[in-house]
Amino acid sequence: SQLGMALARALREEGAETLSVCRSSEGLARCGEAGLCCLSLGEPESLPERCRGLFGEPPAHLVDLMHSRFESLIAGAAPEAIMEWAAVDIGLRARLVRAVGRSMLARRFGRCVFVSSSAAECPVEGQGYYASAKLAGEALYRSLAVELSGRGITACSLRLSWLDAGRGAA
């Protein structure tokens, strides 16, 4: 995503080592063109070891911006599309959180941030599946925080949105 690439560039400018993990070949190509160090998500369970191979250690920080573009009226979605959405937008994230959480637990240190959306609370027509996936992500990260905060791992969710601050009105 544009946000993910901007975040990776900003962190890199601050001296952080970053790795953009992408689900698709298109995402890998965009990150590569932007000069970012990138890796295919593939099987999430192998991500900590693949990071160890690249950086000498598993990830200590995770910013999760993963989401699909699946938007449909709830009653209008094809059953196959719903199953794919659940597997990718919920199941794949759960596997990622589990794998990275376990590797952080072994080190007794980790910081995780899930980037959600205001659609989680207030979806517009056609955003039911997107909103549901964001709510599921928030629940996973909230549960990770509850379960592992006493062991050095913190997790939180951020709901991004536009704010009407009342400025600039004519």
Q: Where are the regions that the model predicts?
A:
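Rossmann-fold cofactor-recognition segment
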Residues: 32-45
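Conserved glycine-rich Rossmann-like NAD(P)H-binding loop of the short-chain dehydrogenase/reductase
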Residues: 16-28
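Conserved mid-core segment of classical short-chain dehydrogenase/reductases
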Residues: 42, 61-86, 126-129
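Canonical Rossmann dinucleotide-binding motif of NAD(H)/NADP(H)-dependent dehydrogenases/reductases
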Residues: 1-17
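Structural signature of the Rossmann-like NAD(P)-dependent dehydrogenase/reductase core
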Residues: 63-67, 111-117, 154-159
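Catalytic Tyr-X3-Lys loop
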Residues: 56, 75-97, 113, 137
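Amphipathic alpha-helical dimer-interface segment in Rossmann-like NAD(P)H-dependent oxidoreductases
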Residues: 88-109, 145-146
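Catalytic loop of short-chain dehydrogenase/reductase
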Residues: 111-136, 141-142, 146-149, 162-164
